[in-house]
Regions:
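Solvent-exposed loop/turn segments at secondary-structure junctions
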Residues: 1, 24-28, 73-77, 105-107
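A bilobed periplasmic-binding-protein/Venus flytrap-type ligand-binding module shared by bacterial periplasmic
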Residues: 1, 96-112
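Bilobed "Venus flytrap"/periplasmic-binding protein-like clamshell domains
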Residues: 1-57, 130, 144-148
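Extracellular/periplasmic catalytic domains that process cell-envelope and extracellular macromolecules
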Residues: 12-13, 92-93, 111-113
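An extracytoplasmic/periplasmic, membrane-proximal ligand-sensing/linker region
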Residues: 26, 30-32, 36, 40-43, ...
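Beta->alpha turn/N-cap motifs
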Residues: 53, 67-76, 95, 102-103
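A ligand-binding cleft/hinge motif common to bilobed small-molecule-binding domains
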Residues: 58-85
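Short beta-strand->loop
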Residues: 80-94, 98
Length: 161
């Protein structure tokens, strides 16, 4: 067991650990890939294992590898017992959810939902990363319907009667 809190904490122990991720993370194209990541943090893992994206969490749970890359808001992290390390050197970009709606959609619903844009704006800044983890966990792990989980969230925040 290691006392790891930040990605840079991996540096002294990486040689004892196996890194695993989906095939695409190991391609040479793009800046957010294995090569640039390990170079940026000066990490030298014992081995690197490429897995199908649909099998990554199952492989992590089975202990096929010790370290992987994930979306921090994925509820499967909790199911797999993964500890999300702080990206203390800022290698990965921050991802903040935002609503995008096509102008023609607003036009199409102008009569039946004239306040659609304002209604969506009520959600701005209301969904924290922990909220996302909780909701995706309920849907992906507990098997609840996304509609039910979303309605419960909206109701608990006074956005749905």
């Amino acid at each position: 067991t290691y006392d790891l809190h930040k990605i840079s904490d991996l540096q002294p122990v990486a040689g004892q650990l196996v890194f695993g991720a989906e095939h695409e993370f190991f391609t040479q194209e793009g800046s957010m890939k294995f090569g640039p990541f390990t170079e940026y943090y000066d990490l030298h893992f014992k081995d690197a294992v490429s897995v199908d994206v649909s099998l990554k969490y199952a492989a992590a749970e089975k202990g096929s590898f010790d370290v992987t890359e994930v979306y921090t808001t994925d509820g499967l992290n909790r199911k797999a017992g993964l500890v999300v390390l702080e990206d203390d050197k800022g290698f990965f970009p921050e991802y903040n959810g935002a609503f995008l709606i096509r102008e023609d959609t607003l036009t199409r619903f102008a009569q039946s939902a004239p306040n659609l844009e304002e209604t969506l704006d009520l959600l701005a800044g209301k969904i924290s990363n922990e909220d996302m983890v909780d909701m995706t966990y309920q849907v992906d792990v507990q098997g609840r319907s996304a509609d039910e989980v979303a309605a419960e969230f909206l109701h608990s925040h006074g956005l749905l009667a």
